[in-house]
Swiss-Prot record:
Protein residues bound to heme b b566: H97, H196
Protein name according to UniProt: Cytochrome b
Organism in which the protein naturally occurs: Thrichomys apereoides
Residues the entry annotates as binding a ubiquinone: H201
Subcellular location: Mitochondrion inner membrane
Length: 379
């Protein structure tokens, strides 16, 4: 009698994806983040579903419905803060996952990589729309400022912004559609993740050496399931510590003030995970130029396969490229810090320098350093 795990049409797919999947024997903890992102997505969908049961997408009651969730619903405060901080964990893992891909040359799998870029854009859109839902000051003004950027598009811009708003300003119609999209997008993300995994399993995983590992594979279960559970426990420890001890650490105090179109907060800024892109946007004095730089700061990821000039896939044995990658990480941290600062000297010039170096490192320094390393190795 054949094993049901290997013969049942549905269970067979799960078996080939998570149990009998041949995996390289040397993949490190950096390969944990994919499964952690999956867990984060599931947590966000579950907590979000429970929040949606009590939330009302109306400008007059949205803020008070969030207050009601925190005060009157059983463990509502826990669900709300787990959802808000879960989003932060999601982005931390997302950035680690992308960093891993760049370091080990995983972008060579073109379909998987481009699917990942589509995923990050979708996740960013979802998080942005979720931020507008509590209808606090930063929700309202963040939504106003970011959607208003589309007015920089020549000819159709102003009409497009009014079409997105559903009126002449961010109002009830905007909040309702943001809620609708914020609810549906995680399910679309789940479908995109399935495609991302489908493409990955066509080629198999990369590994730290960057070499072909077909001659040395081990089953995913039990080796990597146990390894992933360790990562999962560490993630839950971090998330629960954040949620239970300092739930507002990563939030903005302005969002505890109900939205008021007549009172602008002194510093309008998005959530911390968008600050690097926000700093790039603000560093260019021209509106259209800023929007293009903002878009390109994310879409630049699609160029990585074309910019790879090294004869080696991974950065494991390329110390000069490693230095540049860590320089890029430091640069992104500086951009994140600048994005949260007011637009005044010296922050303006620091932001401009950090924005220029961000694009220079990726577009010029990394490819030329790779060529230099080829020369040093006489390749």
């Amino acid at each position: 009698m054949t094993n049901m795990r290997k013969s049942h049409p549905l269970i067979k797919i799960i078996n080939h994806s998570f149990i009998d999947l041949p995996a390289p024997s040397n993949i490190s903890a950096w390969w944990n983040f994919g499964s952690l992102l999956g867990v984060c997505l599931a947590l966000q969908i579950i907590t979000g579903l429970f929040l949606a049961m009590h939330y009302t997408a109306d400008t007059t009651t949205a803020f008070s419905s969030v207050t009601h969730i925190c005060r009157d619903v059983n463990y509502g405060w826990l669900i709300r803060y787990a959802h808000a901080n879960g989003a932060s964990m999601f982005f931390i893992f997302l950035y680690f996952h992308i960093g891993r891909g760049i370091y080990y040359g995983s972008y060579s799998f073109m379909e998987t990589w481009n699917m990942g870029v589509i995923l990050i854009i979708t996740v960013m859109a979802t998080a942005f729309m979720g931020y507008x839902l509590p209808w606090g000051q930063m929700s309202f003004w963040g939504a106003t400022v970011i959607t208003n950027l589309l007015s920089a598009i020549p000819y159709i811009g102003p009409t497009l912004v009014e079409w997105i708003w559903g009126x002449f300003s961010v109002d009830k119609a905007t909040l309702t559609r943001f809620f609708a999209f914020h609810f549906i997008l995680p399910f679309i993300i789940t479908a995109l993740v399935a495609i991302h995994l489908l493409f990955l399993h066509e080629t198999g995983s990369n590994n730290p050496s960057g070499l072909n590992s077909n001659s040395d594979k081990i089953p995913f279960h039990p080796y990597y399931t146990i390894k992933d559970i360790l990562g999962l426990l560490l993630m839950l420890l971090t998330l629960l510590s954040l949620t239970l001890f300092s739930p507002d650490l990563l939030g903005d105090p302005d969002n505890y003030t109900p939205a008021n179109p007549l009172n602008t907060p002194p510093h309008i800024k998005p959530e911390w995970y968008f600050l690097f892109a926000y700093a790039i946007l603000r560093s260019i004095p021209n509106k259209l130029g800023g929007v293009l730089a903002l878009v390109f700061s994310i879409l630049i990821l699609t160029l990585f396969p074309a910019l790879h000039t090294s004869k080696q896939r991974s950065m494991t044995f390329r110390p000069l490229s490693q230095c540049l990658l860590w320089l890029l990480v430091a640069n992104l941290i500086i951009l994140t810090w600048i994005g949260g600062q007011p637009v005044e000297p010296p922050f303006i010039s620091i932001g401009q320098l950090a924005s220029i170096s961000y694009f220079c490192i990726i577009l010029i320094l990394m490819p030329t350093t790779s060529l230099m390393e080829n020369k040093l190795l006489k390749w």
